[in-house]
Amino acid sequence: RDSSSALMAEALDAGAEPVFYGIAPDDEQAIAELVHRAVQECDFVITSGGASAGDYDYVTALVRREGEVLFDRISMRPGKAITFGLLGGKPYLGLSGNPAAAYVGFEMLARPAIRKMRGFAEGARPVQRAVLTHGVKKRQDRRFFDRATVSRDPETGELLVTEAKTQNSALLGTMQRAVSYT
């Protein structure tokens, strides 16, 4: 899965000057070398993949060992596996390697941070009120960012939001069609 290409475009859109260091092999030393290089050359380091607890998820351990992890999980879905901390005195954000989770993590955390660092008054994308076209069960355990499409009621002009039927974060088709989160 390639989360990086889409995130590079989003970082550029947010006002950053993204630098791509390639896709690292599942090798702790190779990953450490790329992250160290990014810390030397960049003001804010964002990685995708390696932020969870799998056999090849080395990045959080690296930040914990050489910097300071401020948090390594967040109560949202998709995107629970996120690491944020300081590495070499610079902010570090480790996003999930899952494309949908990486995108949501970027939108909710990286975009506002980049825009603030660049001096923009508004950090996040604009929020608009809309009417859901169907009922949604409220969930208390975490914040859900369900992909949705938006339309306009031809009679009233109201914005209408329809959640995608499938929210599996591995399915990219719903991401391609989504223009909103509920």
Predicted regions and their residues:
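Short acidic, glycine/serine/threonine-rich loops at helix termini
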Residues: 31-33, 57-60, 86
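Flexible glycine/proline-rich
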Residues: 64-182
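Active-site phosphate/pyrophosphate-handling residues
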Residues: 6, 57, 82
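Generic, well-ordered alpha-helical scaffold segments in large soluble proteins
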Residues: 34, 38-41, 62, 112-116
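Loop/helix-junction capping segments adjacent to catalytic residues or to phosphate/diphosphate-binding pockets
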Residues: 28-29, 53, 103
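Glycine-rich beta-strand-to-loop/alpha-helix junction loops that act as flexible
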Residues: 45-62, 69, 96
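Phosphate-binding glycine-rich loops and their immediate beta-loop-alpha structural context
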Residues: 1-47
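Hydrophobic alpha-helical scaffolding
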Residues: 1, 21-24, 49, 74, ...
